[in-house]
Structure formats: structure tokens, C-alpha cells
Amino acid sequence: LGKINDKWAVVIASDNKKLAGAWVGGQALKLTRATDIAKMLNIPLVYLLNCSGVKLDEQEKVYAGRVTGGTPFYRHAELEQLGIPVLVGIYGTNPAGGGYHSISPTILIAHEKANMAVGGAGIVGGMNPKPYVDMEAALAQIEATKGLRSDPPGSVAIHYGVTGFMREVYTEQEGVIAAIKKYVDMLPTYDLEFFRVDTPQSPALNEMELYDIVLNNKNRPYDMYNVIGRLFDGSQFMEYKKGYGPEMITGLAKVDGLLVGVVANRQGVL
């Protein structure tokens, strides 16, 4: 989570210095959790992308299971259907899995040297009259692509000038960042005053006493009500069903004049 021009967003960034930003086992779950946060909070998802796709010797870890492989890209479609934008700044080379990252967001902003292309045996096979790829077909594909080196299919020239995938292209890397900020600025945001139910105030009890109540010694129990009284506006707390489930404390309180729900474990009960 981060703020872009004072608006919250979920940010996913490739670290191209580690395995060229490749996918490894468990990454799809991490990406899916990030999209879940964007959905729950109704805030944009922003990628800074320079991804070399799936690490080939870990394919079985990436594609096996339900929340893997293409799940993050399906989640992009879900967010867009809900009106939650997915923005991507594209840098460097993004083949295969990196290509899906590139094409599935709502708005694509690219550095002039960026490129994106999906790949895999199935895609290459689909380009061949035969339903599979053999040595003859592979050599034919290699020969055919030699003529594309001056204007490769995944280049900015193609995806900005021909397919129209890329919305904007910048000669400087900083220009991509500035464009992302520009589009985030265009998005609506909540005004907290709409949800404020009271004038903000400090707790009536001394907040600094929390350091004496909650100690590093985890074997020493403490009274959770003493903690609650030093966290919320005016030290006010409206407890819900106090006689049920004594190991838990639930209720309503205010933080900075905003109404919040409270769930706390009671120390020393179980």
C-alpha cells in the first residue's frame, strides 16, 4: 500500500535485479492477495513492470494449483469490471508471463525501450498449420522472424503505433512515473469528512501509559480495557454483548472522529 499524490493505491513492482524479475513459485498467490486488497479497499492497482516471465525450471510450482498461473490476470479483469483501474508502467523486456502482466491492465504506459510479448509452445504451435511444433516448424518460425528484427512484434512501434495497446510512451523513465501520477490524479477519492461522526479528540487517558501497560514481557497479562481506553477518542468505547464470549472484547469506538469496530483478545482468560 502506498500513496500517489495523496491517494491510496496498491503497488506491485518487479525487481529486475533478481532473476530479471521472473516469476517463481508462490508469486501468483502474492499478486492475487494484492489484487484482493485493491478490491476490498476500492483503490487502484499500479504495476511497475520489468518481468522476464516464469523461471523455466520452476514452471511446475507456478502453474500447479488453483491460485496460480493466470489467476492474477483474471483478477485484473474482475477489478476493471468493478470500475477499479489497473495501471502499468512498462520498462525493459517483458516476455511470456511478463507479457500478460503488460496487456491485461486498463491503461498501459511505456518507456520507449520497453517491449511485451506473450509466448509458449502453445502460442508458437498456433502460428503453425500443424497442431504441434516439430523441428521443421521451429526452424521455419526462426527463419520467418529474422525479417522482424528491425521492427519486432513486441516493440513500442507496434503496440503504440499499430495495436494501440500502449496509451502513452516516454523517452525518459521518469516520464512513465509522471504519467501514472497523472492518471491517479484523475480518479475520484473519498472525502473523510463525509464519514466523520464527531469532532476528533485525544483519549481522555494518557496514551503514553501504554508503554507501561503492554510490556515486552509476554508472560505478564494486562487489562485490555486499559489499552482500549488509551487508544480511542475521549477514551469512549461502546461494548457489544459483554456477557458473551468472555475471551473476546467487541464494540464501537471513534478514531479521529471516524466510527470504527473493535475486536480485541482479553488477556488471561484462556
Regions found by a protein language model. Give the residues of each.
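Conserved catalytic cores of soluble enzyme domains
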Residues: L49-L192
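Long, structured ligand/cofactor-binding scaffold of large enzymes
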Residues: L1-L87
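Short, electropositive, low-hydrophobicity segments enriched in small/polar residues
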Residues: V10, G25, D57, A96, ...
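Catalytic cores of large soluble enzymes that bind and process phosphate-bearing ligands
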Residues: W23-G26, A64, L148, F165-A179, ...
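Terminal amphipathic helices with adjacent charged low-complexity linkers/tails
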Residues: E168-Y225
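Non-catalytic terminal/interface segments that mediate subunit docking, oligomerization
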Residues: L1-A13, K17-L19, K30-R33, K39-M40, ...
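Short, well-ordered loop/turn elements at secondary-structure boundaries
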Residues: I4-D6, M40-N42, L82-G83, S102-P105, ...
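Short acidic (Asp/Glu) and glycine-rich catalytic loops that position anionic groups and cofactors
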Residues: V156-G164, S202-Y211, V263-A264
